[in-house]
């Protein structure tokens, strides 16, 4: 076996924290007078920054918007972040770790923040389903490959 294959991957969570949080109920108290049948929209975004060698900040942005009759009942935004040490992997494996594995670690914390905020706004309980960040990351890679192929085709023409 080569030395590279013997090198072990190291993954450590240094810290998990809420970076930013926002809750708005722009149509309260009128929204409380209506029968609660909202349309709930979930938006997710991730980003990562290098803080030091093998040390990364990963930010998971979760936005939940509940609308009723085309009016916003509530808008909840959470930026859940973590500082992670990742050693022994590079390239696509590192991108997968930062773009899928770390968000999987962060999501339960973001979900708990959102549930608490919605409850404090006195809205009915909101249960966010688990998210498959691995599948989202694979979709992202496929889109990048398609864009790269389209861009290389344009350049050759």
From Swiss-Prot:
Entries under SUPFAM superfamilies matching the protein: SecB-like
Superkingdom per UniProt: Bacteria
Subcellular locations according to the entry: Cytoplasm
GO molecular function, one term: unfolded protein binding
Alphabetically ordered keywords of this record: Chaperone, Cytoplasm, Protein transport, Translocation, Transport
Any one GO biological process: protein folding
Stored InterPro entries: SecB (IPR003708), SecB-like_sf (IPR035958)
Pfam families: SecB
A GO cellular component entry from the record: cytoplasm
Coiled coil start-end: none
Family per similarity comment: Belongs to the SecB family.
Function: One of the proteins required for the normal export of preproteins out of the cell cytoplasm. It is a molecular chaperone that binds to a subset of precursor proteins, maintaining them in a translocation-competent state. It also specifically binds to its receptor SecA.
Subunit structure: Homotetramer, a dimer of dimers. One homotetramer interacts with 1 SecA dimer.
Protein name (Swiss-Prot/TrEMBL): Protein-export protein SecB
């Amino acid at each position: 076996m080569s030395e590279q294959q013997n090198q072990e991957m190291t993954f450590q969570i240094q810290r998990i924290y809420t970076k930013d949080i926002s809750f708005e109920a722009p149509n309260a108290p009128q929204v409380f007078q209506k029968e609660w049948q909202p349309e709930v929209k979930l938006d997710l975004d991730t980003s990562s920054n290098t803080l030091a060698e093998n040390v990364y900040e990963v930010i998971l942005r979760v936005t939940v918007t509940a609308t009723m009759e085309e009016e916003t009942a509530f808008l909840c935004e959470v930026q859940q972040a973590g500082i992670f040490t990742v050693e022994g992997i590079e390239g696509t494996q590192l991108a997968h770790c930062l773009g899928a594995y770390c968000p999987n670690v962060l999501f339960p914390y973001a979900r708990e923040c959102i549930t608490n905020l919605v409850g404090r706004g006195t809205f009915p309980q909101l249960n966010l389903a688990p998210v498959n960040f691995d599948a989202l990351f694979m979709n992202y890679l496929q889109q990048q490959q398609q864009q790269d192929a389209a861009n290389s085709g344009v350049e050759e023409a």
